Amino acid sequence: PTYATPAKLIYEWKDYLPEHFATPFAGHESLPPWAVVSLCNWNGGAAKKLSFKAADVPGLPKADAYAAFEVKTQKFLGVFKPGDSIEQELAAHAARVIRLTPLAEEGRYLIGTDLNLSCGMEIKSVSGRTATVRDEVRPHEAKCTFLLWKGGEGAVDPGP
């Protein structure tokens, strides 16, 4: 099933192929809205650094801070303000997918999963550190990464 609108370009298409795409996800029954940014290095011969700003991502809800999580490496990249640059170095023909989670009130936030590139639409519900996957995804389970956000500081929740 379709869970979101098609990806949109973040920046004007100037080079060989577009390199920055964004897909916003809203309307999830148990998660606040987020967006996924895809970075693509179409160059066949060289690595390339690609960057973007959260403020430029279409459909991303406004916030004072965003948690960034990279799907392939399953790494928390940090907390960024809307105007901060988020940069990744991509090998030739490589791509990266980054989930941006708006951070508002203090608490625990789901910032990433390892099961789906949407980083959340495979999740039916979240309670504390427990995420339940949708019936159509089973028998697979998702490894979820949570961020504890308090006093303007974020740290990955180490779990029990």
Predicted region positions:
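Carbohydrate-binding surfaces of carbohydrate-active enzymes
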Residues: P1-G128
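Interfaces that engage single-stranded nucleic acids at replication/repair/recombination sites
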Residues: H140, G159-P160
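Mature N-terminal, pre-catalytic/accessory segment of carbohydrate-active enzymes
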Residues: L110-G152
